[in-house]
Every structure is written in C-alpha cells, then in structure tokens.
Amino acid sequence: MVVIRLARGGSKKRPFFNIVATDSRNRRDGRFIERVGFYNPLATEGEEGLRLAQDRLAYWQGVGAQLSPTVARLVKQGAAKAAA
C-alpha cells in the first residue's frame, strides 16, 4: 500500500521533514517513490514552513494512497492558510 508520510531530515535538534509517497513497508527515512513537499517546523517569519505540490498530492490520493494522520493535519492546515 502506498502512503504519504513524513521522512525526517535535518540535523540533530533541527528537524526538517520531506513529505513523500512511499510503500508502507519501507523505513521512515528509506526509499520513496516521490517527494511531494516539505515541512519545516522551525521556520522563521521570512522562511516558508510548508510546501505541498497539490496536483501530485491529488494524483496519489486518486490512485489510492493513504495520508498519515500528521500529513492529513498539515494538508488541512495548508489549505486553510491558502484560503486566507
């Protein structure tokens, strides 16, 4: 099953997450099919904290990919921010 979830990057105490489409059996930071965005929880005012390729996200959901709970929350948050 394909899932869309966070893959941790960055250094110690400085998290950075790639939002990736991957097989559910792969490791968290292992091989992935496609990178569909990123999330930077420590972004400052001038930096972009969340970027999602909405077209690719819609494609993967259309072919049956499941969102992880955290990614679902981020998608909802990004949609609310885009609407505002």
From Swiss-Prot:
Task: Please list the disulfide bridges.
Answer: none
| GO cellular component term, pick one | small ribosomal subunit
Q: Does the keyword Ribonucleoprotein apply?
A: yes
Q: Which UniProt keywords apply?
A: Ribonucleoprotein, Ribosomal protein
Kindly list the biological process annotations in GO that this record carries.
Answer: translation
- GO molecular function terms listed in the Swiss-Prot or TrEMBL record: structural constituent of ribosome
* Any matching Pfam family: Ribosomal_S16
Q: Does the keyword Acetylation apply?
A: no
> InterPro entries this protein is in?
Ribosomal_bS16, Ribosomal_bS16_dom_sf
Which HAMAP family does this chain map to?
Ribosomal_bS16
Q: Which family does it belong to?
A: Belongs to the bacterial ribosomal protein bS16 family.
Q: What is this protein called?
A: Small ribosomal subunit protein bS16
Question: What is the scientific name of the source organism?
Answer: Cupriavidus necator (strain ATCC 17699 / DSM 428 / KCTC 22496 / NCIMB 10442 / H16 / Stanier 337)
